[in-house]
Each structure stands twice: as structure tokens, then as C-alpha cells.
Amino acid sequence: MKLWGGRFKKGTDELVNDFNSSINIDSRMYKEDIEGSLAHASMLGEQNIISKEDSLKITSGLLEILKRMDNDVINIDLTSEDIHSFVESTLTYYIGEYGKMLHTARSRNDQVTLDLKLYLKKALVKLRKDILYLEEVLLEKSKEHISTIMPGYTHMQKAQPITLSHHLLAYAEMFKRDIGRINDAYKRTDEMPLGSGALATSTYPIDRYMVAKDLGFSKITLNSLDSVSDRDYVIETLSALSLIMMHLSRFSEEIILWCTGEFNFVELDDSYSTGSSIMPQKKNPDVAELIRGKTGRVYGDLITLLTVMKGIPLAYNKDMQEDKEALFDALDTVTLSLKTFAGMIKTMKINKDNMKKSAALGFTNATDLADYLVKKGSYFRDAHGIVGQIVLQCIKDNKMIEDLTLAELKEYSPTFEEDVYDAINLYTCVEERKVIGGPSRESVKFQIKELQEFIHQFKGDEIYD
């Protein structure tokens, strides 16, 4: 059933029907469409726009349809133009002419925006729970590896010794920001648009506040033109999803490197790895590689909607129908990526010895050697130059700094004493960095405590129960 057609003399070309239809995409919003219609029908009755008896017939019919659709008794007719027309035609089939009253004081323009906001609010709640679970996985791994020394990198060159806990907590901070962006997107989505009509509200005495309360919105939108043409909340969500994928992709790239024989820092569980059809020895990090690849897909969803919206005049235009396919694809991709990634991290084995051995190579304690000289009275720039000469000689002689005798060190500066060896021990290098945010046990324990409180705080948020 089409919700329009009275002014047309000819039927729509079948190709146009297929091109125009969105039922394959928006059918996943059937619950939200019915929820919105239930609130709308109740309001129509309360405001005496239709009789309370007729309102009750409509709501009873909608509840029965919802029940039957949930139980697969009613299957969605994919020849319908969209989910809105399908629900209304099904309602009319079940309760007769009364079903034709449902669309009073409503347009598909405000209806589809309502449905999408209802759907997205639920999706954001689920998404935040998925991120919080990943945070819990990182928290537990961080607790286990407070003392697991590894090299920290800049420019993919070994730089300074850190701990695995410190490294994991860096990603925990990224995902904390992601949760903040999800919360912000939720706030912008939590504005009820129904009652805006096609673009200029309605001549009926509707009560938008009643509908907002029934549907759990914190506020109503304040301009009808903006209400039906706004997709900022979708773009904001897609932006947040893109950043989540960027963070997952960065982490995945490191996991891929760490799995190689050249690094051998971690070993992925068999259940999160795949093999080769020709090379029997292979154990491939396909999960991490796919997440890295799917990041571009989510970026594409964001660019799609930004491009769709960039030249649209007020108010609603059919271009906006493209919003849902991009949003749903991104939500599905990020949700599956988060869950799979969390499982991969939770089950992977850490090769502690290899991490420490790698940190011991590459002169990661060179900065600490320079700091030793500074603390003995040298200027930092002079100390930097001295240590640079020491490193150059060590490379030539294939030695580590700690392999040098005190006499050899004194050739570069008489300031060196026996205590230099303790100063450049990797554990000392890590533990001396007690500044908030650093890799020392004291600092990492503080970061872990903050992460625990963050998780506890948001798990207790009533919006997300």
C-alpha cells in the first residue's frame, strides 16, 4: 500500500518502485515504528483528535502486530515502499478502516526521524556496553602486566622502556574518549521530533510533550524545519564510530606486528586465528587484519552522509533516505569489530621474556644515561651529545651500554660512577618515571584505579541500565 497517489493518473514504474523503496533497509526499525505509532495514537485519543475508543482499537491492533512480528507470524512484505507504509497497511488489514486514522497529524518526514532516533538511542546504549566490556578486558590485562617491560616506540624505532600495562592503558584512554563521544551523540539524538509534520507542524492540537514522555525522550525539538531535515545526530554518531574503528585499527596494526616472528611479543589464541590453504605452518591474525580493513568501510559511511547532506536545502529531501544504510552498516561493523577484538585481546598469550629482551636491545636506556649525567651536574644538551657518542661506539662494537666497563664510560665523562649501572637498569628506567601518566608501578596503578572508577561510573548510569 502506498501512502500517497491520489493526485497521480498513472502508476509508478516498477523500476522506480524498486529504486524508491527502502523496505530492505528500514525494516529493522519495525519495533521503533510501532512504538512511535503507539505513542502517537494514544496522544490523538487524549487530545480528542480521535475518540478514545478509536485510539484504543489502534493501539490494540499495533500491539498485536508487534507481537506477531516478534514471533515471525507476520513477515515483512518487501514489496512495500518502506516500513511505515507496511505497518499502516497491516494495521488497516487487521482492524479495518480505523487504521486509516493513525496518520492523522503526522507525516512520514517526522515519523522516519522519530523511528531513527528511537533505534539509534538503543543502538548507542548497546555500543557503549560493548566498549565498556573492551575496557574491562584491557583493565584485567593491565593488572596482570604492571611489571612486564617492553620497548616503547617513536617513529617505529625503539625509544624508551615502558610496560605492557602502560601501553594497554593508552588504548583504554582512547576508548574512554570514544565513550564520551557516544554519550554526546546520545544527547543530540535524545530530542523528540514527532509533531513537526512534513515541515510546518500541524493544525491539530497535538501534545508533543506527552509523546516525548511516553517514548522516553528528555526534550522535544524546537523548530519543525530543522527537525525533519536534521541528520547531524547520525553524522555525529558516524564520526564517533569512525574514531572507534581508527583506535581499533591502530591497536590491530600493533597486534599484527607483535605476532610476527620478528617481534614475537604475543601469540593469538587458535580460536582467533586462521590458517593458509597452501602453507601448513601459517597462523594468521585475520581478525586484526579485517578490523584494519573494515575501518575504511566505516570512514566511507561517514563520508557518504556528509556528502549527501552538504547541498540539501530545507526541509526534507529524498536524499536523506541514504542515511540509514550508511548508519546501519557502520553500527553493524563497529559492533562486531568491538566484540571480536575484545575476545582476541582477552585470549592472547603474552611473551614477557621476548618483550623484555627486545627492550634491552636498541639502547632504550640512553635517555636515562643522559639524565644520570644531568643529575650529576652536566647540562642536558652536553649530556645528550656524550651519550650519542657512547651509543655510536656501542653500535660499532656490537655492545649494549651496560656492557661497557666503568673505565670505558669515564673516557667519555669523568662524572660516571659505579651507580650508573643501577640508573640504566630497565626496571629503574621505568620506576623512576613516577610522573602521572608514566609507566612506573605507582603511576600505572593510579591509571588502573581511574579506569576502574570510570567503568563503575558509567555502568551505574541509569540511561544505560
Curated annotation (Swiss-Prot):
**What Pfam families does the database record attribute to this sequence?**
ASL_C2, Lyase_1
Family classification: Belongs to the lyase 1 family. Argininosuccinate lyase subfamily.
The broad enzyme category this protein falls into is lyase
Q: What is the lineage of its organism?
A: Bacteria, Bacillati, Bacillota, Clostridia, Eubacteriales
What is the protein name stated in its UniProt record?
Argininosuccinate lyase
What's in the keyword line of the UniProt record? Amino-acid biosynthesis, Arginine biosynthesis, Cytoplasm, Lyase
What molecular functions are annotated in GO for this chain? argininosuccinate lyase activity
Q: What is its main location?
A: cytoplasm
> Can you name a GO cellular component term?
cytosol
The cross-references to InterPro entries, in alphabetical order and at most eight, read: Arg_succ_lyase_C, Argininosuccinate_lyase, Fumarase/histidase_N, Fumarate_lyase_CS, Fumarate_lyase_fam, Fumarate_lyase_N, L-Aspartase-like
**What are the EC numbers?**
4.3.2.1
Write out the annotated subcellular location: Cytoplasm
| Single GO BP term | L-arginine biosynthetic process
Q: Which reaction does it catalyse?
A: 2-(N(omega)-L-arginino)succinate = fumarate + L-arginine
Identify the metabolic or biological route this protein is part of: Amino-acid biosynthesis; L-arginine biosynthesis; L-arginine from L-ornithine and carbamoyl phosphate: step 3/3
